[in-house]
Amino acid sequence: MKINILTLFPEMFDIFKHSIIGRARENGFLHIETINIRDYTLNKHKKVDDYPYGGGAGMVMTPQPVVDAIKAVKEKNKGKVIFLGPRGKTFNQEMAKELSKEEELVFVCGHYEGIDQRVYKYFDLEISLGDFVLTGGEMACIPVIDSISRLVPGVLGSEESFQDESYYDGTLEYPQYTRPFEFEGEKVPEVLMSGHHENIRKWRRKQSLLITKERRPDMFEKIKLSKEDIKLLKSK
């Protein structure tokens, strides 16, 4: 997958040089490039913002450098142009799965009090992380790209690595344990030590359902429970 990020702060994305995403880039599964919007401004002082018409606090990103940056990138990246903003669709795992199927994506990060409205016609999709305010689009862009990238074939090495995780199938993840067997008087559930794969699978499924029901009833209501699921929930 090829990802271009249009931003005023390219250095904020150095995080993608490390860990799993960094290795995926080295191995050719991901190509991530940052583009500094400021490089496209025609203002001799390199300004990319100005006061809002009608008054109000803060500054607004001017349309010219953003649009020119988008046009330049689109010459080599035909992917969807995605803007991170509070008016967008709330990002979730299902959206991450759909976007991970794309070969190319372009992300635009806003800053200050936002971007001139006349730029919005260049966006194919607007994404929001939720009902809260961040200091800039970069903060939202990082988890969105991370979530999408890890679903790209080859990035995690094994599809099984993410199939059991929270949200993948509409449930929260089951509890995980590792050594030692006993810690501060609390022992690992015996079923996980049994070596009986079917019993372990059922235990994990039941725990996922119970945790989802308790902590995210809104998610639980959307789950199409199988006969086995119903039986597991009724069992002690």
Swiss-Prot record:
Name of the encoding gene: trmD
Classification via SUPFAM superfamilies: alpha/beta knot
CDD domains in the record: TrmD-like (cd18080)
Primary location class: cytoplasm
Entry binding sites for S-adenosyl-L-methionine: 110, 129-134
Family membership noted in the UniProt record: Belongs to the RNA methyltransferase TrmD family.
Name used for this protein in its record: tRNA (guanine-N(1)-)-methyltransferase
Function summary: Specifically methylates guanosine-37 in various tRNAs.
Cellular component, GO annotation: cytosol
Organism, as annotated: Clostridium perfringens (strain 13 / Type A)
UniProt-listed Enzyme Commission number(s): 2.1.1.228
MF-aspect GO terms: tRNA (guanine(37)-N1)-methyltransferase activity
